Amino acid sequence: SKVIAKLGGTSKAIGILAGNSGKAIQDALDGEGLAHNFRFVPGETRTNLKVIDPENHTNTDINEPGIEVDAPELTALLYDLLKELKRGDIVVLAGSLPKGAPKDTYYTWVESCKKAGAKVFLDADGELLAEGLKAAPYLVKPNNDELSRMMGRELKTLDELADAGQALIRRGIEHVVVSMGGRGALYLRKDSVIYAPALKVKVGSTVGAGDSVVAA
């Protein structure tokens, strides 16, 4: 939502929060004038720490496990989302799911949003991505490592990544974006493949880079 706003667009953040950490996230969005519709549940939203070592050029992620959210709570959140949707809206489903969430959650959500007339962007990994792909979202944005895991082999060259992306197109996905860090990104659809090299900039942290690609 923050990147979309900086690029001149509008969005609404929808999700599940808990406790003081969740309140801090909500307050931060309010402070930036960003629309949201969160459901609060018992517990505490997890805190993820990113330790950046500028001398060795390394990032260390310390991610807490997070709270458990059951299927009825997720269903209520989905209904909140569907009530907001208008035909032609774009829905971004991104990230991991909380403990307790059914493995086919993204499949269910993609299907439901498509029936409401929305275009769904899916940014996930592993089994969550595999399940979501079964519902043929409008766009998916794996990075090169995620796409390699999906295909069961290491994809090194641009041609290998492009071929794997086209395999997703043949499964009914209209648009595929493959982010490759400092190597740039690939954009694929049925009749074209476009390669965009990365800008040469000093990297402070890569946290949120993939999310920013989706927002753009």
Label every PLM stretch briefly.
Residues I90-E160:
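Conserved beta-alpha-beta core of the PfkB/ribokinase-like small-molecule kinase fold
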Residues K50-R87:
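Conserved phosphate-binding/catalytic loop of the ribokinase/pfkB sugar-kinase fold
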Residues I16-G19, V41, P54, S96, ...:
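Cofactor-binding loop segments of dinucleotide-utilizing enzymes, especially the Rossmann-like FAD-
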